[in-house]
Amino acid sequence: MLEDLRLYQLISPSLPVGSFTYSQGLEWAIEKGWVTNVTELKHWLSNQLMDSLATLELPVLAKLTQLLQQEEWQQAQDWCDFIIANRETKELRLEERQRGLAFSMLLPKLGIELNQTTLPMVKQTQVAAFALAANHWNLTPTKLAAAYAWGWLENAVIVGIKLVPLGQSAGQQLLLEMADVIPQAVEKSQHWPEHLIGSFTPAQVLASSRHESQYTRLFRS
């Protein structure tokens, strides 16, 4: 049970790495009227969940977990590089590294030691941090993937509540509905071919690139 509680701590939007400060382009999409209500937000998030998390982050997370456990350092580093290469805007790459840097300071406090090989990976991408935590706490791949997806979803809904804006009840209802999609995303990720790993979310990429120069904004991405 303690391992599960530690995992819940890692995926919290407010703690420990400040995920709440990022919208991943959603702030600009709301500003420009692409997302104006709970139905449109659900569509936006569903596309990201099934066409990015399920086809990029979650498959790479599973691979990194296995490779780091086997001490296949070079292959693990290659997948960390791959994650960064798939962050298609400057602020998305910066977000990935900022979260990774925060995890590099947090993990040792949780008893997960980093060495000269794993530290640069964690600083590069938070995905490596989750993989190391999974090995340290003996988490199953399915539990790890579901938790990672839930942390992303909860943060995105919080952004929607603040900016669309949505009421708290509408936000909770959206979480309930989207939670039903997470098992589908996890299953998809577990059967996704290696040669197809990547994301296809052009609207998010455009929104993120425009958010970089948005005049007034609350979020860092």
Curated annotation (Swiss-Prot):
It is found in: Cytoplasm. Pfam families: UreF. One of its GO terms (molecular function) is nickel cation binding. Keywords: Chaperone, Cytoplasm, Nickel insertion. The keyword Chaperone applies. InterPro entries: UreF, UreF_sf. Belongs to the UreF family. HAMAP family: UreF (MF_01385). Required for maturation of urease via the functional incorporation of the urease nickel metallocenter. This is Urease accessory protein UreF. It comes from Aliivibrio fischeri (strain ATCC 700601 / ES114) (Vibrio fischeri). The lineage of its organism: Bacteria, Pseudomonadati, Pseudomonadota, Gammaproteobacteria, Vibrionales.
